Curated annotation (Swiss-Prot):
Entry membrane topology: Single-pass membrane protein
UniProt source species: Rickettsia prowazekii (strain Madrid E)
GO cellular component: membrane
Superkingdom, natural source: Bacteria
Protein name listed in UniProt: Uncharacterized protein RP014
Chain segments annotated as transmembrane: 25-45
Gene Ontology annotations of biological process type: metal ion transport
Length: 299
């Protein structure tokens, strides 16, 4: 009888031990599950949105608004006209992994439309923003600082709606960014105050001279080598005060070296910007470079 009692007692102790072990294991797995849940929640909550933008000037305006809270990648990273961008395999990967894609329209950066045709991301088409000042068949809109301000304000609304976790950051950055653009406008007006007129040979520069007191003559031609074209250009230079012609960086300045010796040839970086690491100062830096390029018309 004593033996049976001892046996039962041992069984009870073993059962209790097993129960405690099971409870400990359950508690361990419950704690582990909670830890993994919080890690996953933290990673998903604080993961930066991935935004793909067709060209660097638009990327740089966006960076003023979101700074380092968003991963921004540009597709066309060069000084060339976006019309001629050749799609690369890396572009396809960028778009596929993006939370949002921003481009201008099929006419300007149409390569982006090909990339987004089979994707379901949020697509922002800038030409749909009706408050922008636009020139027919010309979409270098960022060179007009008033347009840059409109883009900042439109992007602010879009990003707060799609990424509400960025609202505080955007609300803090927007007024600062608008002030920076106002400063650029003041610098531009001050530096250009003695420039009376210029001659534009590329429509890509046209937006840059909106809202200034500079009179602009425009001579846009596909072929810039004909005698008629050169004759017309010489006539415009003769009647000009500053005798300053403005080309885009895709045009060949060598064609104009035999013009009037007093003619100043300005090559303006107006097509796109070859900047790989976009940050919140990129737009101001690039725009100031363009102001300094045009200042050569004075001397």
């Amino acid at each position: 009888m004593k033996t049976n009692m001892l046996t039962n007692n041992c069984k009870d102790k073993i059962f209790i031990k097993k129960s405690h072990t099971i409870l400990r294991l359950l508690y361990f797995f419950k704690s582990l599950a909670m830890i993994l849940f919080f890690i996953f929640f933290s990673l998903t909550s604080y993961a930066k949105p991935k935004i793909v933008v067709s060209i660097t000037p638009i990327s740089s305006i966006l960076a003023m608004l979101v700074k380092d809270k968003v991963d921004i990648e540009s597709l066309a990273v060069n000084n060339e006209c976006p019309h001629h961008h050749n799609i690369k395999p890396s572009d396809i990967t960028k778009v596929r992994n993006a939370d949002m894609v921003i481009y201008i329209n099929e006419q300007f950066d149409g390569f982006t439309e090909k990339l987004i045709s089979n994707n379901n991301q949020n697509i922002i088409k800038i030409s749909d923003i009706k408050s922008l000042t636009t020139i027919k068949n010309n979409w270098h809109i960022w060179l007009d600082l008033n347009n840059a301000k409109i883009l900042l304000q439109e992007f602010a609304q879009i990003f707060i709606k799609n990424f509400p976790q960025l609202q505080k950051e955007i609300n803090n950055n927007l007024p600062i960014a608008l002030k920076e653009l106002n400063k650029l406008q003041d610098i531009k007006n001050n530096e250009f105050r003695t420039i009376k007129d210029i001659i534009l040979l590329s429509d890509s520069s046209e937006y840059f001279f909106l809202n200034t007191n500079i009179k602009t003559a425009k001579l846009y031609r596909e072929s810039q080598k004909s005698l008629r074209y050169i004759s017309k250009l010489e006539e415009l230079i003769k009647g000009s005060n500053n005798k300053c012609i403005v080309l885009s960086n895709k045009q060949k300045s060598q064609l104009y070296t035999k013009l009037n010796a007093k003619t100043k040839i300005i090559i303006l970086n107006s097509e796109n910007w070859n900047v790989k690491n976009i940050n919140s100062n990129t737009f101001q830096d690039q725009y100031l470079q363009m102001i300094n390029q045009v200042k050569k018309c004075i001397h």
